[in-house]
A protein has these predicted regions:
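Glycine-rich phosphate-binding loops that contact phosphosugars or nucleotide phosphates
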Residues: 1-138, 172
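Short, structured loop/turn "capping" segments at alpha-beta junctions
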Residues: 123-126, 154, 193
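A short, well-structured juxtamembrane/interface segment
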Residues: 146-163
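Acidic catalytic cores of enzymes that act on phosphate-bearing nucleotides/polynucleotides
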Residues: 161-201
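Adenine-nucleotide phosphate-binding core of ATP-dependent small-molecule kinases
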Residues: 138-146
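Short gly/ser/thr-rich secondary-structure transition/capping motifs
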Residues: 22-28, 148-152, 196-201
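A general structural signal for well-ordered alpha-helical packing
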Residues: 140, 154, 179-183
């Protein structure tokens, strides 16, 4: 879910920062990633904060002499001890296994913290940031309509949907991270065979 949140924030971050953003699993970073620009910031995300793979990724970044930041909902997160800076995901603790607030919360936290950094560095103006925030609030305000439309859609297709033995979630461009996260949530909650694809694949 944290990886998907990074993918979800990526396009916005590249647009605002005018910098290349790479998303990868912490184990891949720890085991094989070489970073040649020592001004690189590596952000380790873990909603629960105790992910040992995220700790290993942050430690690998430190060993390479890179900047590190940790993001977690947990105020006493282990990942906070392995990064230079820490930022809380303010969504509250989710008691169920399928983390839904954490996905949205991590995505927005990344967007906000790096927008503030961009403002401080003179990369992004306050006026532009206000425009982005207005668009975000508009999307959030439209969520009840989306939920209602999705519920109505399910009501129309449930008799065909329930006997399914395999589910495929598709999407594209800025929604691809949502495809991956949606497939994961179906797997975690419905326990049915599910795959997420870019719609062109």
């Amino acid at each position: 879910t944290s990886y998907h949140a990074g993918l979800s924030a990526k396009n916005y971050l590249e647009e605002v920062l005018n910098l290349k953003v790479f998303c990868m699993y912490p184990t891949q970073f720890h085991r094989s990633e070489k970073v040649f620009n020592k001004k690189t910031l590596v952000i380790g995300m873990s909603q629960g904060g105790q992910s040992l793979s995220t700790v290993e990724g942050l430690d690998a970044a430190t060993t390479q002499g890179l900047y590190t930041a940790a993001v977690s909902e947990n105020p006493t997160a282990l990942v906070f001890d392995h990064a230079t800076t820490k930022t809380r995901i303010e969504v509250g603790n989710e008691k169920c296994g399928a983390k839904t607030k954490g996905y949205a919360g991590t995505t927005v936290t990344l967007m906000m913290m790096l927008s503030e950094w961009a403002i401080a560095k003179g990369i992004l103006s306050e006026e532009s940031f206000e425009g982005y925030k207005e668009r975000m609030f508009k999307v959030i305000g439209n969520m009840p309509n989306i939920v209602n439309a999705a519920t109505e859609w399910y009501g129309r297709i449930k008799d065909e949907f329930l006997p399914a033995k395999r589910i495929i979630v598709v999407g594209y461009d800025g929604n691809y991270a949502d495809v991956l996260e949606g497939a994961l949530k179906v797997l975690e909650t419905v326990r049915q065979g599910v795959t997420g694809y870019d719609i062109e694949e």
